Amino acid sequence: MSVVGIIAEFNPFHSGHEFLLNQARLIAGNDPIVVVMSGNYVQRGEMAIMSKYQRAKVALQSGADLVFETPFSTAVEPADLFSLGNIEQLAKLGVTDLVFGVENANLNFAYLGSKIAEIPQNHMDFKDYSQTYSTQYNQMVAREVGHEVNQPNAILGLAYAVANHNLGSPLKLHPVNRIGAGHDDLLQRNGVVQSASAIRNLLLHGEDTSNLKYWVPKAEAIELSKQEIYPNWNLLYPFLKYRIESSSIDDLRQIYQMSEGLEYKMKQEIHLSRDFTEFLRRIKSKRYTYSRLRRLSLYTLLNVTQDDMIASFNEESLMLLGFSKTGRQYLKKNRKDFQTEIISKVDKRSAKSGSLALQVRTDRLFEQIMGVDQNFGQRPIEV
């Protein structure tokens, strides 16, 4: 039995994702395709453009059999922890194979992952403060394994491979060549496949949405066209500004990943910044990537502390967002053997501890912005 897993954000789901699901189906055959998908907050430190249930529904309609929500404590983390948490959860669900999109599927990711995992993580190698940690890490990888990997999906694919190796290689890796636009490419008007970031930019800049039907499934294109609010940092910035200005230095110091005096820098620069882009520019240094600072801003906005993340990570459960007929059968037959708790319905008891407590709390802001309940009263989607 080949139970194929996919780690995803689907932010939003587009034809490139549909291609990846089709490739996964070639491996799975009649066996299930299991997706672990980030919820209403994504790895780069932003709100998702659509709700987790909207994105899960499109994924199920496009060929996925089970969609679970990646806990916040894994979803909003750098690539290494994002990969480790997601692969560990897939293995606990009985997944045997991992399919992921990259720019060059000819690379032997399993081999490269094992070689990188053997490199001592000696922080003395990363003391050049004129460059970010990630830049120095990529340079070290190129030096040690003989391959320069600097494209975003290949970097993430390597993180999957390293995590898989460190967990004892529970999953067989299947890299698939991406089709269409690159990760951050602008929309190519005559093309068919567009990147998620390009589609988000189109929506956020109020451009014509008539071409969406060529890039995303028809039902999703209709929903996106009708959607009145597209979450973004400029929308959230007043809330972040209030949070920072009303918090003491000691309060800010408790925020997850707040370090090296960034609490003082954020306090100082928030008064001088007209919008989130300017704020990021003002607190940016060569030591930190913009992604790291966006995640830190999100933790600050949502008041996520070190203790919150530890409690969530130590008691991670998985929220079931939806299933197909095949997915239901797989759940019924194998749920007792899963090594993680599956939550199908949020109630007051389950929402008080572990990863679900953090999920429910952080989702409240998304609910306020979008006006749609995300946990209480929701049931898994069935297609």
Swiss-Prot record:
One of its GO terms (biological process) is tRNA modification. InterPro entries: Rossmann-like_a/b/a_fold, tRNA(Met)_cyd_acetate_ligase. Keywords: ATP-binding, Cytoplasm, Ligase, Nucleotide-binding, RNA-binding, tRNA processing, tRNA-binding. One of its GO terms (cellular component) is cytoplasm. Its EC number is 6.3.4.-. It is found in: Cytoplasm. It catalyses: cytidine(34) in elongator tRNA(Met) + acetate + ATP = N(4)-acetylcytidine(34) in elongator tRNA(Met) + AMP + diphosphate. ATP binds at residues 7-20, 101, 153, 178-179. GO terms for molecular function: ATP binding; ligase activity, forming carbon-nitrogen bonds; tRNA binding. Coiled coil: none annotated. Gene3D superfamilies: HUPs (3.40.50.620). It comes from the Bacteria. NCBIfam families: PRK13670.1. Belongs to the TmcAL family. PANTHER family: TRNA(MET) CYTIDINE ACETATE LIGASE. Catalyzes the formation of N(4)-acetylcytidine (ac(4)C) at the wobble position of elongator tRNA(Met), using acetate and ATP as substrates. First activates an acetate ion to form acetyladenylate (Ac-AMP) and then transfers the acetyl group to tRNA to form ac(4)C34. This is tRNA(Met) cytidine acetate ligase. It comes from Lactobacillus helveticus (strain DPC 4571). The gene is tmcAL.
